[in-house]
């Protein structure tokens, strides 16, 4: 035995000795707890809570708290956790993974650490892989928690936000992994604090933890909305509008390739889109469409910045090589604006509003633990990614299952013939059989062959969780034959029917090896629960996917030497099993490397997401004036604009700064180049900033009180942040696709992604601050539109345009016949005619 292996075994033994010592201390309270009346036992919960508030740690409370749960489970459920279950509970409380075999009572084991951690009052999430298991476990184990005075909630996808909020406020919340993730993302998209449903993430206990944190690690949770045809129409409308403009209607800053509408252009936009003010807060999305249409038409040049392919696709031209960049798209909606400009089909895309992987979702919990019967093979990944140890827990009774040596056949046909013959023989003697397959297609194929052989059976393809649990529960009855994909029915025990033990227990037949040893072990673990007899047998063929991809030359050469005329010949040897296991290890290594790379990429977004979400949450929960934050954004925007021209010709620089000031800060006629000539950059910055502060104060003076000001500030920031963040996610996704090709140029794609992703994030922050500045300076604020602004903060751009109010009915007593657009409205509202009754006229 190698020194490393010996050390691992010794470490496991040492850990088990520590756990056993704690378990014995828990057991020492058994007689005392049994002597308590129901009332006195239930009174332990408020006592523990008070002791925790007084400074005792959960570790100090553990022995007594675990003992209370054991006794409560005995009285309520008629179940009494064994010592090994106590040991498993301690491992869970420590934030690790106890590897407990199938049938060893993981669900009951979880009650002890869940109860203990719920005493802190910060919420415990019990995570399952489907809603059936969440509902089942919450109903069954919830009886114990409720009896002990703790509240239990079930978070289901169909529940309303109010119902979800109530579930999350419970001491213990049962939910699926996906629903917890989606709720987290949705909470970071709301505008009001009262619309959030989750509390801060405290302790998660994940059932079937390997399935959630390993198998699904590469699958991101994505909240997205398809870009509707209405939105595509807005690209076209914006394009049609900018094509009507004259050169005086927009101002181009050539060095920075930026463009904006002049005052005359703004007037035309308001008339074209029938708006009172283009820069009102609810029109943030529309200004984005117009800005992109301006860039597409007057800055982006055909055959220089892009080309149109024969298929009508817009292809970006690499400015360094002159080659087209297949698969890349301009971000921020610019690509769609160019498609509208060139009259080609606007590609409908789903817009990702938020996304997160399970890896990063569950790493946000203060403490994370999980249960499974098969995790040791993924020990390195659990340790490196989640900082969780795998602690194998002894079974309560010795395992009596017989695991037969694998059987290898030359062809799929000969293998399936052997499987059907084995199933038939066992069916005829009454022994229940569970046939495990890797794919649904294999399940259907075997089912067809069993029908031909006259063998009644059930087929389970993991499509209906409620039905599958019932089928799996009956799979241990005499004469039962069940076909299931490997993951189907996971989490439900197979109990043996009457007389089945004498027949050898449940026989599990694997029709091929999965690429993961862990999945094979899960299938085997269906049989032989809690010391029951059982058997497992795997059938393989050289035509299996795993063998074709990773089968060794030794196996193939051995079969070549055999009589090829007899395809039913079978190989049965330990050497074969070792070779297959070696192939599985290679696949597992490849998969781990892939997941690790996914995590490296996602960590870039994680860091950025945490910054955006933290700032967003700060805005939502703020009960203070957000003026200092907005003023800081205005200051940085002005500084960036002035610095961008510091190295250009002074006259050109002054002209460009004046252009920026007119389009983004002050009324066009109130500033000119003459006013800024002779000033240094710092003096120009101060002058523009002081002018901006005057406009800022004037804007806020239009709102009636501090509550109205705070609401306006919040909606202003949140709308712009959400728009820019959504666009940034798309841009990062495109960047990730692009950098993958750079590996061929000896560049590390991950490093390239990190570097460019950081620069893009900085650019996004600048864009957010610019839009906040421009909207704050240019918006026409009306107190009566405050509630409307909040409503618009959660709608799409298309809905924004459609929802515009057209204006009040005409006052028949007023004379509108000779009123020009920019004249004061005759109704004496104080507004320009175009912004009042003229809206309907035009």
From Swiss-Prot:
Role, per record: Part of the Sec protein translocase complex. Interacts with the SecYEG preprotein conducting channel. Has a central role in coupling the hydrolysis of ATP to the transfer of proteins into and across the cell membrane, serving as an ATP-driven molecular motor driving the stepwise translocation of polypeptide chains across the membrane.
Enzyme's top EC category: translocase
Record localization: Cell membrane; Cytoplasm
UniProt entry tagged with the keyword Membrane: yes
InterPro entries in the cross-refs: Helicase_ATP-bd (IPR014001), Helicase_C-like (IPR001650), P-loop_NTPase (IPR027417), SEC_C_motif (IPR004027), SecA (IPR000185), SecA_CS (IPR020937), SecA_DEAD (IPR011115), SecA_motor_DEAD (IPR014018)
PROSITE patterns: SECA, SECA_MOTOR_DEAD
Quaternary structure and partners: Monomer and homodimer. Part of the essential Sec protein translocation apparatus which comprises SecA, SecYEG and auxiliary proteins SecDF. Other proteins may also be involved.
Main localisation: membrane
SMART domains hit by this protein: SecA_DEAD, SecA_PP_bind
Gene Ontology annotations for the cellular component aspect, listed alphabetically: cell envelope Sec protein transport complex; cytosol; plasma membrane
Catalytic activity: ATP + H2O + cellular proteinSide 1 = ADP + phosphate + cellular proteinSide 2
Sequence similarity: Belongs to the SecA family.
Highest classification ranks of the organism: Bacteria, Bacillati, Bacillota, Bacilli, Lactobacillales
Binding site for Zn(2+): 825, 827, 836-837
GO annotation, biological process: intracellular protein transmembrane transport; protein import; protein targeting; protein transport by the Sec complex
Protein origin, superkingdom: Bacteria
Protein name (database record): Protein translocase subunit SecA
GO MF: ATP binding; metal ion binding; protein-exporting ATPase activity
Cofactor: Zn(2+)
Entry binding sites for ATP: 85, 103-107, 493
EC number: 7.4.2.8
Cofactor note: May bind 1 zinc ion per subunit.
Keywords: ATP-binding, Cell membrane, Cytoplasm, Membrane, Metal-binding, Nucleotide-binding, Protein transport, Translocase, Translocation, Transport, Zinc
Membrane topology of the entry: Peripheral membrane protein
């Amino acid at each position: 035995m190698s020194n490393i292996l010996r050390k691992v075994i010794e470490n496991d033994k040492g850990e088990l000795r520590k756990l056993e010592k704690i378990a014995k201390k828990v057991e020492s309270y058994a007689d005392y707890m049994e002597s308590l009346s129901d009332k006195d036992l239930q009174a332990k919960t408020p006592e523990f809570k008070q002791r925790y508030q007084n400074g005792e740690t959960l570790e100090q409370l553990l022995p007594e708290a675990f003992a209370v749960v054991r006794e409560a489970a005995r009285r309520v459920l008629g179940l009494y956790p064994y010592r090994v279950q106590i040991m498993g509970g301690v491992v869970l409380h420590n934030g690790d993974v106890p590897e407990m075999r199938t049938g060893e009572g993981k669900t009951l084991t979880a009650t002890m650490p869940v109860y203990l951690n719920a005493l802190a009052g910060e919420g415990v999430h019990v995570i399952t892989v489907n809603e059936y298991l969440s509902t089942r476990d919450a109903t069954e184990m919830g009886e114990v928690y409720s009896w002990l005075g703790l509240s239990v909630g079930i978070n289901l996808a169909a529940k309303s936000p109010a119902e979800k909020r109530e579930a999350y406020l419970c001491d213990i919340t049962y939910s699926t992994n996906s629903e917890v993730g989606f709720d987290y993302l949705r909470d970071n998209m709301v505008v009001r604090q009262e619309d959030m449903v989750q509390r801060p993430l405290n302790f998660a206990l994940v059932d079937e933890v390997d399935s959630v944190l390993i198998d699904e690690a590469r699958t991101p949770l994505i909240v997205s909305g398809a870009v509707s045809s209405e939105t595509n129409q807005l690209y076209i409308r914006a394009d049609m509008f900018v094509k009507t403009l004259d050169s005086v209607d927009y101002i181009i800053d050539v060095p920075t390739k930026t463009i904006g509408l002049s005052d005359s252009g703004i007037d035309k936009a308001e008339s074209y889109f029938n708006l009172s003010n283009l820069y009102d807060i609810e029109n943030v999305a529309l200004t984005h469409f117009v800005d992109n249409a301006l860039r597409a038409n007057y800055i982006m040049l055909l055959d220089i910045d892009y080309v149109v392919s024969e298929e009508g696709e817009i292809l970006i031209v690499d400015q360094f090589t002159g080659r087209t960049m297949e698969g890349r798209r301009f971000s921020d909606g610019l690509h769609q604006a160019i498609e509208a400009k060139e009259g080609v089909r606007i590609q409908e895309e789903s817009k990702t509003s938020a996304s997160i992987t399970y890896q990063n979702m569950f790493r946000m919990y203060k403490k994370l633990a999980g249960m499974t019967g098969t995790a040791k093979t993924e020990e390195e990944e659990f340790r490196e990614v989640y900082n969780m140890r795998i602690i194998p827990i002894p079974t309560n009774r010795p395992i009596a299952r017989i695991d037969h040596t694998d059987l290898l056949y030359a062809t799929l046909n000969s293998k399936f013939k052997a499987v059907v013959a084995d199933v038939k023989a066992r069916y005829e003697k009454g022994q229940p059989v569970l046939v495990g397959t890797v794919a649904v297609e294999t399940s259907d194929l075997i089912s067809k062959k069993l029908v031909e052989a006259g063998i009644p059976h059930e087929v389970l393809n993991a499509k209906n969780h409620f039905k599958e649990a019932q089928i799996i529960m009956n799979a241990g009855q005499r004469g039962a034959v069940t076909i299931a994909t490997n993951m189907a029915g996971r989490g439900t025990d197979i109990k043996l029917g009457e007389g089945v033990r004498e027949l050898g227990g449940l026989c599990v037949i694997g029709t091929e090896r999965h690429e993961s040893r862990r999945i094979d072990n899960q299938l085997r673990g269906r049989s032989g629960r809690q010391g029951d007899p059982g058997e497992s047998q795997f059938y393989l063929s050289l035509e299996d996917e795993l063998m074709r991809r990773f089968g060794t030359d030794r196996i193939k050469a051995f079969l070549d030497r055999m009589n090829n005329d007899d395809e039913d010949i079978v190989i049965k040897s330990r050497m074969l099993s070792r070779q297959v296991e070696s192939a599985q290890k290679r696949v597992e290594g490849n998969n781990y490397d892939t997941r690790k790379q996914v995590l490296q990429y996602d960590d870039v977004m994680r860091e950025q997401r945490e910054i955006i979400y933290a700032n967003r949450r700060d805005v939502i929960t703020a009960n203070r004036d957000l003026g200092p934050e907005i003023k800081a954004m205005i200051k940085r925007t002005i500084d960036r604009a002035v610095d961008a021209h510091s190295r250009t010709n002074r006259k050109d620089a002054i002209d460009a700064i004046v252009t920026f000031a007119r389009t983004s800060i002050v009324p066009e006629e109130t500033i000119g180049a003459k006013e800024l000539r002779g000033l240094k950059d710092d003096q120009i910055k101060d002058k523009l900033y002081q002018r901006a502060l005057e406009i800022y104060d004037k804007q806020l003076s239009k709102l009636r009180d501090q509550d109205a000001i705070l609401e306006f500030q919040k909606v202003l920031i949140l709308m712009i942040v959400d728009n820019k963040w959504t666009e940034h996610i798309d841009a990062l996704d495109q960047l990730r696709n692009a950098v993958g090709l750079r590996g061929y140029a000896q560049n590390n794609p991950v490093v390239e992604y990190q570097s460019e992703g950081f620069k893009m994030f900085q650019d996004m922050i600048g864009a957010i601050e610019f839009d906040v500045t421009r909207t704050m300076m240019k918006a026409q604020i009306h107190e009566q539109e405050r509630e409307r602004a909040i409503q618009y903060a959660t709608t799409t751009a298309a809905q924004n345009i459609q929802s515009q109010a057209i204006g009040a009915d005409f006052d028949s007593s007023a004379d509108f016949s000779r009123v020009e657009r920019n004249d004061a409205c005759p109704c004496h509202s104080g507004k320009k005619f175009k912004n009042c009754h003229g809206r309907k006229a035009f």
